[in-house]
């Protein structure tokens, strides 16, 4: 090990590690294993759901899934392990957006705007939707600690247009942001969430009559847009005592004659092929591609697995998400993009790795640019 890569065990170093990762990542690592979680206080029950067992939700059977490391090993690694090139030195490029930019988008088409990480603004036949919006500085329960953004969003919460619908994949802090939801609470016409997440939103000020809560394979419709909650292989929880009390999901969005898939967070599992078979393929697939590690192989896909899942889904365009905004793992900040770009080129897959703030029009040809190359 070189001196540059050798862990430093000073109080200042440990405090820095805690501020960067401690609060949210300790909760996440504990949630990976049942041993960290109390089984008491099962207030909400969803016995009608095939996914609900005992006092929580579970994944579909997957005999090929690899086990995760213990919570202690994960936590120890975040505290004293070596992290190299996980945070960019150079600024991440951002294309700032204005209301005029959004208004100029063809109201008859479907558009996807990259806000960062897994957050996206959609313009579906003239109406605006949000997916997993996170506008806060940190993906954490605290403003002073936890993973910090690499870049600003391309527009502010105050600049958002009227939002017709909002889709949530699960309740982790990098997908369900309290400050964002509290601001949007009365400004969104309809929320679509997995089972159990409704209660989270009500606690953030969202009106009860605006929330549609769905199990896997259940669907809903709002002003011409059809949505279906589909399976994912992940977990949920926001504290050390609420493991899997809410469901996690991927989503199918149908607008006009086009279908968009959003993976949410997921490990690789046979469900992707089932989703592809049931819906007959997708015009665009937003696929998780980041935060993977050999310590937690069941809950996040490697780039190779993301490509395989995309092929299982019968997608036309692979859109890479869940990267280049937060430092959530041990791979370099650019590794997800490097690997998926090379894999897609080798397998002749049409790839989309848009710059933050870039607009992708579904079904419209575009030239993909490796914008991250050359950045440190």
Residue ranges, per PLM feature:
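Acidic/histidine-rich helix-loop elements
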Residues: 135-152, 235-243, 293-299, 327
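Cap/insert and terminal regions of metallo-dependent hydrolase folds
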Residues: 37-66, 149, 156, 160, ...
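Divalent metal-coordination and catalytic microenvironments
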Residues: 122, 132, 170, 227, ...
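Catalytic core of the metallo-beta-lactamase
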Residues: 120-123, 221-282, 297, 301-305
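Active-site metal-binding loops of divalent metal-dependent hydrolases
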Residues: 133-135, 171, 232-233, 264-266, ...
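Metallo-beta-lactamase
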Residues: 36-159, 163-174, 194-262, 283-290, 339-359, 363-366
């Amino acid at each position: 090990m070189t001196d540059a890569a050798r862990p430093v065990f000073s109080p200042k170093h440990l405090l820095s590690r805690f501020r960067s990762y401690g609060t949210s990542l300790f909760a996440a690592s504990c949630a990976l294993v049942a041993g960290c979680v109390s089984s008491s206080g099962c207030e909400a029950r969803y016995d009608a759901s095939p996914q609900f067992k005992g006092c929580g939700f579970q994944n579909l059977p997957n005999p090929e899934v690899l086990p995760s490391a213990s919570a202690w090993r994960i936590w120890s690694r975040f505290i004293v392990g070596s992290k190299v090139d996980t945070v960019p030195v150079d600024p991440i490029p951002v294309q700032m957006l204005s209301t005029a930019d959004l208004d100029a988008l063809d109201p008859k088409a479907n558009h996807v705007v990259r806000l960062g990480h897994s957050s996206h603004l959609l313009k579906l036949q003239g109406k605006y939707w949000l997916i997993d919006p996170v506008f806060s500085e940190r993906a954490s329960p605290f403003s002073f600690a936890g993973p910090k953004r690499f870049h600003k969003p391309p527009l502010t919460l105050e600049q958002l247009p009227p939002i017709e619908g909002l889709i949530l994949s699960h309740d982790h802090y990098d997908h369900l942001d309290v400050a964002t939801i509290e601001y949007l609470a009365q400004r969104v016409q309809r929320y679509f969430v997995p089972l159990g997440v409704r209660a989270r939103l009500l606690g953030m000020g969202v009106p009860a009559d605006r929330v549609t809560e769905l199990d896997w394979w259940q669907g809903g419709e709002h002003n011409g847009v059809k949505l279906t909650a589909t399976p994912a292989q992940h977990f949920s929880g926001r504290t050390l005592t609420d493991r899997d009390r809410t469901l996690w999901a991927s989503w199918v969005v149908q607008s006009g004659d086009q279908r968009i898939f959003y993976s949410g967070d997921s490990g690789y599992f046979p469900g992707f092929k089932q989703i592809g078979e049931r819906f007959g393929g997708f015009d665009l697939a937003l696929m998780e591609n980041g935060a993977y590690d050999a310590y937690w192989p069941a809950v996040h896909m490697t780039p190779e697995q993301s490509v395989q899942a995309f092929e299982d889904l019968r997608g036309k365009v692979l859109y890479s998400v869940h990267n280049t905004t937060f430092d959530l793992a041990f791979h370099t900040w650019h590794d997800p993009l490097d690997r998926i770009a090379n894999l897609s080129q080798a397998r002749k897959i049409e790839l989309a790795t848009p710059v933050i703030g870039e607009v992708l029009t579904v079904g419209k040809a575009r030239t993909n640019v490796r914008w991250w190359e050359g950045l440190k």
